[in-house]
Each structure stands twice: as structure tokens, then as C-alpha cells.
Amino acid sequence: MIPKDKAIEILDDAAKMGVKSIIFTGGGEPTVFPDHLEVFAHALDLGLECSLNSNGAILRNGWQDVLPDFTYVRFSVDAGDANQYAKDRRVSSSIYSTVLNNITKVCAEVERSKSDCVVGAGYVVTPDNYIHVYEGIARLKHTGVEYVRMAAMQSTEGFDAYPGNTWERSRAEVKRAKDKFDDDTFTVVDLTDNVMGAKPDYDFCGFQHFVTYIGADLNVYRCCYTAYADLGRINSLKLQTFAQWVKSESTRELLTNFSARSCDNCALNEKNKVIMYLTDPDPKHVNFV
């Protein structure tokens, strides 16, 4: 874990340098950190827009004073019933109801406080859990979330990671749920057609310049997909501040000399292409809408 004082230092530097937003996320679970509410509150006090990606298993005393002030909170559930949840997460089946109850509490508090915080859920569809997708979405809608984000499993095998006809059946279950449950207060966001599997055919990775991923090991990485891998590592904050890291010539060289072609697959290809277009001094068809 990042020590609390170091986390505060990073946030202070980020705010001073003009960073606009921060996502508290994994790998790992942010709310396991004992002082996470203090860190969250400090980020808010600095004027940073904050968001949280959480498994929803933990709500510590005082969360009501912090989470409603976040821009969004998204809970990763990825299961339609307690047995599937226990199997995939390797935890007691009772945790599933705890998670759903916690999500319900957060949604209720956001509504009570008339907060603008958007509370949603994330659901990764796999060859193992797709059977209960319909029931899972129904349960999540009942908690009061505004949306559930349905995503495909990110695998270097692409569509081949779904054996037989499980891919088609997965998509069908998501569509069935969307047709049934979409209304003015709830949306099934279907992103299941975005399966990782495209190797970049360009060199410039613009995403690494816009989003900085700081791991729990205090290493800085190019993105969440290359986190905790040598390919993604861009130096460390263990012996320097975040501000020093940003101004470091070594950091600049590692960013400049990196080729996106080094990645076998990239889930951020479309974002990189947009960044390349926006930063191109002479983009094609710029005068046409």
C-alpha cells in the first residue's frame, strides 16, 4: 500500500500542477486502505474531481460525508448470484448480499443528500458468469444504481477466450436484459462488443501523457493494462515526489521513446487515435463535420 503521508504528498503535487481529476481504483481494493476516507477527503478539499472504483464490500464509518461529493462511484460486481460471486472472488457467498446492501446504501444517501454523484455498477461478462447476467442486472437495478456497464473479458485471445457459442449467448443475455430493464432512471451500457485483441499499428501512445497510473508499489505506469509490468513502468515515486517525477528528464525520455507497437494488444486504440488526430498539426478533413 502507498503510505498515507505519501498519498497526501502525491495529491498535493497533483493539485499544484493543475491535475483536474483522480480515480481511486485497483489493482487491489482502495477501501482496504485503513485511512482511505481521510485521503479521499483531502483530495476533495484540494478541489480535485474524485471518483472511486470499488468492489463494494467495505463501507467504513464516515463514508456518508465523503462519497456523495465524488463525481462518480462505480461498484464492480461481475456476478448474478451469491454462488457465482463466491466462486469467482474466492470469498464467502454472504459477501454478495453485503455488496448489494452497501450499493443500496450509497445510492440512497446520494439521493437523500441531492448529490450530483453518479452511482453505477461494472459487470465483466465471462464464459463462466454469463448464464446469470439477466438476474444480476435485475438485482443491480434494484439497488438504485443509474447504470450497469457491461464489458467483455479483456483477454489477449480476443473472441477466442469465449469457447463454443458462449460469446453469442453472452451478448444475447445482455441484450435481453437491456430490452427489459432500460428506462428513464436506469441504463444497461453494453460494451461487450469491445474485446481486446488489436495490436497497435502506430507508434505514438498519447494516452500515457493524459492519464498517469500510480500503483500501490509506488511505480508509475503507462496505463491500467500495463500496470505492474516492466513494459508499462515509468520510474518510481519511492525516492522522489510526483512533481519531481513529472519534471524528470528520465521520465520524459521513457515517455518519448516508447512505441505503442511494443504492446501486443491495446484496449485503448480508439482513444489513442483520437489523441493523435487532435494533436496532428495538419489533420485530415478538419473542415468537415
Which stretches of residues belong to each language-model region?
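Radical SAM enzyme [4Fe-4S]-AdoMet core and its adjacent flexible, acidic
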Residues: 2-5, 12, 16, 46-49, ...
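Flexible mid-to-C-terminal extensions adjoining Fe-S/redox cofactors in radical SAM and related proteins
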Residues: 199-202, 219-289
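Conserved alpha-helical substructure of the radical SAM core
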Residues: 1-65, 69-71, 165-169, 177, ...
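Flexible loop residues that form catalytic
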Residues: 27, 56, 78, 153, ...
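Short, well-ordered turn and helix-capping elements at secondary-structure junctions
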Residues: 28, 192-195, 249-250
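Acidic-and-aromatic substrate-binding clefts and catalytic sites of carbohydrate-active enzymes
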Residues: 30-34, 57-60, 126-131, 199, ...
